[in-house]
């Protein structure tokens, strides 16, 4: 039991450090996206993403705003301003967790 205490302390410290850095990108008002979804000109150097920190205001279309196109009858939170980019019979949905 005594040997697990130092291991627990190291893990706890690492988690606190990671969580303090994890919010840097988001706390600045940006978002984490895969490299393939964030063009070079929208990428930022803030930390906290396992992917890349992206200036979401520079992105356009449903996917660029973090949504996905779904049929009109699908229940979701709709980004109405981006639904036109989905095409006829589709709407832009974001999933709230």
From Swiss-Prot:
UniProt signal peptide: 1-22
Domain of life the protein comes from: Eukaryota
Location relative to the cell: Secreted
GO biological process: acquisition of nutrients from host
SUPFAM superfamilies: Defensin-like
Pfam families, A to Z: Inhibitor_I68
Keywords per UniProt: Fibrinolytic toxin, Hemostasis impairing toxin, Metalloenzyme inhibitor, Metalloprotease inhibitor, Protease inhibitor, Secreted, Signal, Toxin
One MF annotation (Gene Ontology) recorded for this entry: metalloendopeptidase inhibitor activity
GO cellular component: extracellular region
Protein family according to the UniProt entry: Belongs to the protease inhibitor I68 family.
Function: Potent competitive inhibitor of metallo-carboxypeptidases CPA1, CPA2, CPB, CPN, and TAF1a. Also inhibits human CPA4. Accelerates fibrinolysis in vitro and may contribute to the maintenance of host blood liquidity during feeding.
Descriptive protein name: Carboxypeptidase inhibitor
Naturally occurring in which organism (per UniProt): Rhipicephalus bursa (Tick)
């Amino acid at each position: 039991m005594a040997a697990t205490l130092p291991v627990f302390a190291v893990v706890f410290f690492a988690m606190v450090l990671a969580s303090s850095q994890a919010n840097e990108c988001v706390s600045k008002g940006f978002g984490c996206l895969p490299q393939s979804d964030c063009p070079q000109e929208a990428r930022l150097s803030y930390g906290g993403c396992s992917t890349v920190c992206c200036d979401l205001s520079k992105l356009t279309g449903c996917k660029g705003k973090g949504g996905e196109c779904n049929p009109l009858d699908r229940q979701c939170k709709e980004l109405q301003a981006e639904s036109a980019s989905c095409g006829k019979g589709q709407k832009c949905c974001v999933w709230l967790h």
